[in-house]
């Protein structure tokens, strides 16, 4: 959520109401938590202590520098490591074959060098790799044979 302190308090009030009326807890997910200033982070503290919300914060920054100490001390940090290139390459191959959620209904001839390039340039980020694959396939017209040929030059531009 893109929030100021008033927005956060409103979400907390909704969580309190949900708990009192329905006995249901609320999960509060904040992406890019490092963008919250100290006041925005501090407003969460009493509600984490009371258990009003289950809090999940995501950040691409080092949480020990980007998140204030009181909030960090009430949190469990789960560092996520970059996905190895070999696993990204395997993911891209599955995306090319998957007819339901991937590009398996498209006729794609992907050079190994191009696929490996996309995996290497993703910096361990599966979302980046999949987005680059999609750009490569969708921005390349099919040849006369009806096949989309993705070579290294296409991959470098994706």
Per-segment meaning from a language model:
Residues 1-2, 76-89:
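Conserved AAA+ ATPase "SRH/arginine-finger" region at the nucleotide-binding site
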Residues 8, 31, 44, 59, ...:
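Conserved RecA-like P-loop NTPase ATPase core
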Residues 12, 74, 87-105, 138:
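Conserved AAA+ ATPase "sensor/coupling" helix adjacent to the nucleotide-binding pocket
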Residues 25, 103-121, 150-155:
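Short conserved motifs of the RecA-like P-loop NTPase core
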Residues 1-27, 38:
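Short glycine-rich substrate-engagement loop in P-loop NTPases that contacts/grips substrate
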Residues 116-121, 127-142, 154-157:
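C-terminal helical "lid" of AAA+/P-loop NTPase domains
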Residues 16-17, 30, 34-73:
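Conserved catalytic/switch belt of AAA+ P-loop NTPases
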Residues 1, 33, 60-61, 83, ...:
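Short, ordered loop/turn segments at secondary-structure junctions
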């Amino acid at each position: 959520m893109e929030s100021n302190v008033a927005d956060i308090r409103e979400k907390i009030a909704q969580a309190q109401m949900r708990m009192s009326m329905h006995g249901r807890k609320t999960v509060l997910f904040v992406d890019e938590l490092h963008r919250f200033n100290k006041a925005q982070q501090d407003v969460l503290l009493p509600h984490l202590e009371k258990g009003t919300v289950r809090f999940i914060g995501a950040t691409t920054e080092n949480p020990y520098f980007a998140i204030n100490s009181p909030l960090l001390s009430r949190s469990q940090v789960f560092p996520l490591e970059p996905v190895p290139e070999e696993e990204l390459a395997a993911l891209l191959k599955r995306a090319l074959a998957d007819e339901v959620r991937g590009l398996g209904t498209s006729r794609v001839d992907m050079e190994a060098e191009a696929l490996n390039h996309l995996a290497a340039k993703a910096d361990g980020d599966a979302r980046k790799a999949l987005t680059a694959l999609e750009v490569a396939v969708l921005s390349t017209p099919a040849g006369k044979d009806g096949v989309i040929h993705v070579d290294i030059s296409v991959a470098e531009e994706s």
